[in-house]
């Protein structure tokens, strides 16, 4: 959530510098000038159809839609070229300018054709690696299954390293609320693909409210607080199966789980200070308790990346397994847990956790308030500029 807000704020800011920052690719469109021209009504219907898409078409397609819309309604690009650090507006300008002198009628037709090609996404589902049994419906970013007394919530954006976008935040909350009431005995979170989760998705910057950056920061803080609260209040045993690298909030939340099992190829990284931010997920409280204040400081403030073995030695991870046998060993154990008396598990968790719950909610509220201020700071924006410039040189 923090990363997504920062990406948007960075994109809105023009910083005079010689740094080269990654931006969206210039859109290349193949136009058919002899195609039948779409009517104005067809054009308007297509604009409405875009709002009904259930699956995010991706940034490149969004830029194409933007460019074609501008070309169809205003003609060739007539805006001055934005500065190099005004990432979003520069990407929009590049996309629109690439259309050259394409007639409005042709742009309108291409807009209609593009939207028509996207229509299958109204019914498409998220991609799942072969062998994954999808038994849930209604989720675009998750695979949720319930079998053998286990509800499994799998992050399902493997091509994006399971980065958490706004839709996934809401879907995880919905899945947790459903799992708290279903017949399963335990609930497991894991990732599809090579990553457990790479943390927040930096492309969460398009839904900007009329109130601008201040309202965006406030809304994100409210969402983050509610999201973390779902983990604090979850009544059943909650287990993380960390199948690969974990970054940011996917790490900080682990202090709220009842058990954490990791592959030996997993790593744990919280680069908050590098991005001018502060801890989240109650980690400012749970991590010092779990691993000592000194070790928590090394990770949360100085951004040390832990191996699975180091995370286990410091108490963040329950047990580490060889990657070659990880899935088999862990799921054998989880199936055994799911055969234990369910009421005993819930009651025992309540006894262990209830004294901390009020404190955790207070910590969560404080962390979100602090982050709201950090997201609005120049220091935070500058840190993200430096991060993106380094990334572009890799």
UniProtKB/Swiss-Prot annotation:
GO MF assignments: delta(3)-delta(2)-enoyl-CoA isomerase activity; fatty-acyl-CoA binding
Residues with N6-acetyllysine modification: 51, 62, 92
Lineage of origin: Eukaryota, Metazoa, Chordata, Craniata, Vertebrata
Pathway: Lipid metabolism; fatty acid beta-oxidation
CDD domains, per database record: crotonase-like
Residues engaged in binding substrate: 198-202
Annotated motif Microbody targeting signal, positions: 392-394
Key words of the record: Acetylation, Isomerase, Mitochondrion, Peroxisome, Phosphoprotein, Transit peptide
Post-translational modification N6-succinyllysine, affected residues: 51, 55, 62, 70, 81, 90, 92, 161, 289
EC numbers, comma separated: 5.3.3.8
Superkingdom, natural source: Eukaryota
Name of the protein described by the UniProt record: Enoyl-CoA delta isomerase 2
Matching Gene3D superfamilies: 1.20.80.10, 2-enoyl-CoA Hydratase, Chain A, domain 1 (3.90.226.10), Lyase 2-enoyl-coa Hydratase, Chain A, domain 2 (1.10.12.10)
Coiled-coil annotated residue ranges, if any: none
Region (ECH-like): 151-322
Species whose genome carries this gene: Homo sapiens
Entry's family note: In the C-terminal section; belongs to the enoyl-CoA hydratase/isomerase family.
Cited function: Able to isomerize both 3-cis and 3-trans double bonds into the 2-trans form in a range of enoyl-CoA species. Has a preference for 3-trans substrates.
UniProt tissue specificity: Abundant in heart, skeletal muscle and liver. Expressed in CD34(+) T-cells and CD34(+) bone marrow cells.
Top EC category: isomerase
Presequence positions on this chain: 1-38
Residues annotated to bind an acyl-CoA: 66-70, 92, 111
Site (Important for catalytic activity): 280
Record-level GO BP terms: fatty acid beta-oxidation; fatty acid catabolic process
Catalytic activity: a (3Z)-enoyl-CoA = a 4-saturated (2E)-enoyl-CoA; (3Z)-octenoyl-CoA = (2E)-octenoyl-CoA; a (3E)-enoyl-CoA = a 4-saturated (2E)-enoyl-CoA; (2E)-tetradecenoyl-CoA = (3Z)-tetradecenoyl-CoA
Ranges where the ACB domain occurs: 39-124
């Amino acid at each position: 959530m923090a990363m997504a807000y920062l990406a948007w704020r960075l994109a809105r800011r023009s910083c005079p510098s010689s740094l080269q920052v990654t931006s969206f690719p210039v859109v290349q469109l193949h136009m058919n000038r002899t195609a039948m021209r779409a009517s104005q009504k067809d054009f308007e219907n297509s604009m409405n159809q875009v709002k009904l898409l259930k699956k995010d078409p991706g940034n490149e397609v969004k830029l194409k839609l933007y460019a074609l819309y501008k070309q169809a309604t205003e003609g060739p690009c007539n805006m001055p070229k934005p500065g190099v650090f005004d990432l979003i507006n520069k990407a929009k300008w590049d996309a629109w300018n690439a259309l050259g002198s394409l007639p409005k009628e042709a742009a309108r037709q291409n807009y209609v054709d593009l939207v028509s090609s996207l229509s299958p996404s109204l019914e498409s589902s998220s991609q799942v690696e072969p062998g994954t049994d999808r038994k849930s419906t209604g989720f675009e970013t998750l695979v949720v299954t319930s079998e053998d007394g286990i509800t499994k919530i799998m992050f399902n954006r493997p091509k994006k390293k399971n980065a958490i976008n706004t839709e996934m935040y809401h879907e995880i909350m919905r899945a947790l609320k459903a799992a708290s009431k279903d017949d399963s005995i335990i609930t497991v979170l894991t990732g599809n693909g090579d990553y457990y989760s790479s943390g927040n998705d930096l492309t969460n910057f398009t839904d900007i409210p009329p109130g601008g950056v201040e309202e965006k920061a406030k809304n994100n803080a409210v969402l983050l607080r509610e999201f973390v609260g779902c983990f604090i209040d979850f009544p059943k045993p909650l287990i993380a199966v960390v199948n690969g690298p974990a970054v940011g909030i996917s790490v900080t939340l682990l202090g709220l789980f009842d058990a954490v099992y990791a592959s030996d190829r997993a790593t744990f990284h919280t680069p908050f200070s590098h991005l001018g931010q502060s801890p989240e997920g109650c980690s400012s409280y749970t991590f010092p308790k779990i691993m000592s204040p000194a070790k928590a400081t090394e990770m949360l403030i100085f951004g040390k990346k832990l191996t699975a073995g180091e995370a286990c030695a410091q108490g963040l991870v329950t047990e580490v397994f060889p990657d070659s046998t990880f899935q088999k060993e862990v799921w054998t154990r989880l199936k055994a847990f799911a055969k234990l008396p369910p009421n005993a598990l819930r009651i025992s968790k309540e006894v262990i956790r209830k004294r901390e719950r009020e404190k955790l909610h207070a910590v969560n509220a404080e962390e979100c308030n602090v982050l709201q201020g950090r997201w609005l700071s120049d220091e935070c924006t500058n840190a993200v500029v430096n991060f993106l410039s380094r990334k572009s040189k890799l």
